[in-house]
Amino acid sequence: MTCTGVGLHSGAPVSLRIRPANAGAGIVFHRTDLDGFAIEASGRNVARVSYATSLMKKGVLISTTEHLLSAFTGVGIDNAIVELDNLELPILDGSARPFVEMIQKAGIRKQRKARTYLRIVREIELREGDKFIAVYPADAYSVSYSINFPHPLIGKQSFCVRLTNGSYLKEIAPARTFGFLHEADAMRQQGLIRGASIENAIVLNRDEVLNPPLRFPDEFVRHKVLDLIGDLALLGKQILGSVVADRAGHAMHTALVSRILRDRSYWEETALEDEPAMPALASAASLSV
């Protein structure tokens, strides 16, 4: 599978190709512009978490990983090789839907290895001021997220989803990233959102959306759920647990990942009896963007 686009923050053109990987390989990024240097999609490689999640290994950076990793989780892909020829993944339309469509077009097959999960066995709660994130033991993966923005079209929003029966594809994948016009100049001076446009983000001025319509009335909080799912993919396995977040962001998402990986007493590895094999990409496909 291949696609081309621009990085949300760098504004740099990038080509991305996704290939099948062996069972147990996990998700691995390869910088083809740097002789295929490999960076594993792991919480141990998290480097930057300001407005996006970035991974770094031996000084080599991969930026804005969350949308693709979220799509992988949403369709159940555990193993893939992701090749890109620049430092930042393409933003495409600002959601995970284009990635999901690419994967669906390629097809998914079962691999000859039992799929295992990371089952939460002990609650974890993290707080930072008015920000909060936690995960509690549960038999399935669910997310409950709340946000509060001082904007008349956002305000307080909450959304809950259980990641079963295609809920991700319908309820989460289409939700786009968003930003505020009055913050754009300052962010660009910081080297951010140089690739942002009304084609790849919801853009708001002080009282309206500049590129309507919204895909959901609460698209803003749904996108936060999308980001969280992508960041939690850095655990290396899909979790069985109930995640609750309030005004969190990439920094808190990845802090939770680090806490889980650091202390084995919070989780156990388990397989489900009715899911005997790992899903993987079946073939290659392409998407023009």
Language-model regions: role of each:
Residues 1-78, 83-289:
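C-terminal regulatory domains involved in ligand/effector binding and gene-expression control
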